[in-house]
Amino acid sequence: MTHKLTPMMQQWHQCKEQAGDCLLLFRLGEFYEAFFDDALILAQNLDITLTQRQNVPMSGIPATCLDGYVDRLVSRGFKVAIAEQADNTEGSKGLVPRTINRLITPGALLSSSLLPEKANNYVLAINQVGSLYGLSCLDLSIGTFLVAEYDNTKDLIEAICRLAPTELLSHAKFYQKNEAVIKQLQQHLRITLSEYVSWAFEYQSATKKLYTCFQVSSLDGFGLQGLVPAINAAGALLSYIQDKLLLPISHLSIPKIYGQQKHLLIDKASQTNLELLSPIHGEHGKGSLLQVMERTSTPMGGRLLRNTLINPFYDLKEITLRQDSVEFFLQQADLRKILKRQLSCVRDLERLATKISTSLATPKDIGTLRDSLLSCTHIADNLQNCALPEFLENKFLIAPPLCSLIKTLSTELIQELPLKVSEGNIFANHYHPDLLRLRNIKENSKSWILEYQERIRNETGIKKLKVCYAQALGYYIEVASNLAPQLPKEFIRRQSRLHAERFTTQELQQFQDEVFSVEDKLQTLETKLFKELCFYIVEHRDLILKLSTAVADLDYVVSLAELAAEYDYRRPLVDHSDALSITKGMHPVALTLLDKGTFIPNDTVMHSAQTRMILLTGPNMAGKSTYIRQIALLVIMAQMGSFIPARSAHIGIVDKIFTRIGAGDNLSKGMSTFMVEMAETANILHNATDRSLVILDEIGRGTSTYDGLAIAQAVVEFLLFTDGKKAKTLFATHYKELTELEMHCQHVENFHAMVKENSGQPIFMYEIVKGHSKKSFGIHVAKLAGFPLSVVSRAQQILHQFEGPDLRPEPEKAQQLVMF
């Protein structure tokens, strides 16, 4: 059917075939047009008009608004291909050539308003060889390049969920073979699936791509020897970025093995249950631990805080180094204030370095880099005479080559830089000998025009004669139509207007040629100088990134000190013991949401040789869930190197945190609440260790009472008596039968949420005390929830019958015919 299409539509079809599953935006003059199904998608998602020509649906967007519209499409998960008109087509005849020069996908963003300021934006490739899975992920905006390998899908899925990529890349066979894996990932992540050619995932192709990218002949120096699935994924990802998306890869860091440094492991379910990054309900981010802890001043510090929150340290040295730094800045309030102000002037050094390395930087970006580097020198000056803790020692000794770069940027650039190179006025006059000369000629042209205008007014006697400039005409002389006959013959008519005539002269034309030539020369010179400056900056990229890491580390510990000062956090003792002792501990999020002084603190004492499991009973709304979550959050904060909301704490390092909390169950996954509960509990039983912390909130609710009780007790016994699984466990339950375990096992201790009664009405004290709860007060909670009073009254009657000698309540007479 192609022969029936116009030449332009044939060209569109060729581009569309190249674009694949991308939405194609096709440049036509001052618009980008979409056709057929793409036009429908464009119109529906951008709220623009859908039209048609010769029965072909079409819609379009102005070229000047391209970036904003593309961002909106990508934010909704679409991949977009841009087909541009070829350059230098003036005077050419026939159809203008068009080629795809950009493909934009959610995970492959170099520079975009969609990039989260304080989070990574990963595209992740995945590959399988036999029973092994290899993954590789890139954050193109900062050059981070990671690889990893797993021998089971559970660890694979957990790793991908922690990285939280926005785009997943593989080949058709992998997607077909691993539908269950992809389905699980889509349940946890908002992710765009991309497909690439299978041969790119083969070892020979992948290694060749890696060799070329990093200019090496072996990958052993990267520590990748033997990691065939990971190497395959890494090579395919580089090929996809460079060959398919047409993006640069020269700025990427060498691949690092993800997860090589051991961390406190927090699985995706626990991240969600503990509301680490976002709340289960409510506004995005608000009410999360991240939102409470976020006091960073730089994008790099913010990304470091976020990544450390979901990957706290397991190495005691790493924890102690950061604690020492937090303590140092906590005691230095004036210095902390100065540093916070200076850190707030440092922009995203990592992403600025990437933009410059990939030739995407504007003069304004260079100015931002200059100002940020200058702020770093001010930070270094303020730290110079301080007895810094070990964590920050020598991190702000700025290398001489970087000092030279900072000096160049500070002295050789104009203070207010333009957005585009073509606007000029980037460099100081003394930066290049031709700059001042050309600028003087350009500047003197203004006075020449005024002098010329005055001279020909005197020569012609026409006092209202004007010398003007228009983009289309250039310089011209304008007089009223009735005065035009008075002009000498050497005046050449250019244009007639309603009441005016426009002329030029040989002298004016010669002047214009000289001025235009100067402007062209000036723009060419500044463009050349700008490119040279960018190359000079790229030579210092490693030093800039090293300084960026130092800024992130400083921002991290200063922000934690600021948090500790604001809420009177205390330094926990963290060591290799198996202690978990917290005095007057408080939930860090709830503490910020309540009026000052109203949150009730509670103690916790657990030790493997003594209490290894706390069975917590008490009515709903009495604070049980808040308390057990609180313990997990305080452990996480402590292993981040942070101070915590407690009077004191002694925390033995934890290797894993597991939670089973029903509030976040997602029934859209196709599993019942009970099945979700059992699956999460099974994960805990299989993977907990003696150094783990387990939080269980109501096990066995979704089945019969005796089934549920049996499951709950079996879980308790497993965690108490199975070698290698004796994790510290906080178990909130309504099964009062479980509390009898305290009499038979020395490692179990009963606690309950205290409730006082006043005229039969419960008063929740929010205190956790020894012993088990006597009443559940469930009917009272139902009343508070708005149950009809008749239902509340009937429930009370049934409860009394249950508590009496006859444990089977009789139905009300009015209901007997209905029930039987």
UniProtKB/Swiss-Prot annotation:
Keywords: ATP-binding, DNA damage, DNA repair, DNA-binding, Nucleotide-binding. SUPFAM superfamilies: DNA repair protein MutS, domain I (SSF55271), DNA repair protein MutS, domain II (SSF53150), DNA repair protein MutS, domain III (SSF48334), P-loop containing nucleoside triphosphate hydrolases (SSF52540). ATP binds at residues 618-625. Signal peptide: none annotated. It comes from the Bacteria. One of its GO terms (biological process) is mismatch repair. InterPro entries: DNA_mismatch_repair_MutS (IPR005748), DNA_mismatch_repair_MutS-lik_N (IPR007695), DNA_mismatch_repair_MutS/MSH (IPR017261), DNA_mismatch_repair_MutS_C (IPR000432), DNA_mismatch_repair_MutS_clamp (IPR007861), DNA_mismatch_repair_MutS_core (IPR007696), DNA_mismatch_repair_MutS_N (IPR016151), DNA_mismatch_repair_MutS_sf (IPR036187). Induction: In infected human monocytes transcripts are present by day 1 post-infection and last for the 7 days of the experiment. In patients with confirmed synovial Chlamydia infections, 5/8 had transcripts. In infected human Hep-2 cells, transcripts are visible from 11-48 hours post-infection. Pfam families: MutS_I, MutS_II, MutS_III, MutS_IV, MutS_V. One of its GO terms (cellular component) is cytosol. One of its GO terms (molecular function) is damaged DNA binding. Belongs to the DNA mismatch repair MutS family. This protein is involved in the repair of mismatches in DNA. It is possible that it carries out the mismatch recognition step. This protein has a weak ATPase activity. This is DNA mismatch repair protein MutS. It comes from Chlamydia trachomatis serovar D (strain ATCC VR-885 / DSM 19411 / UW-3/Cx). The gene is mutS.
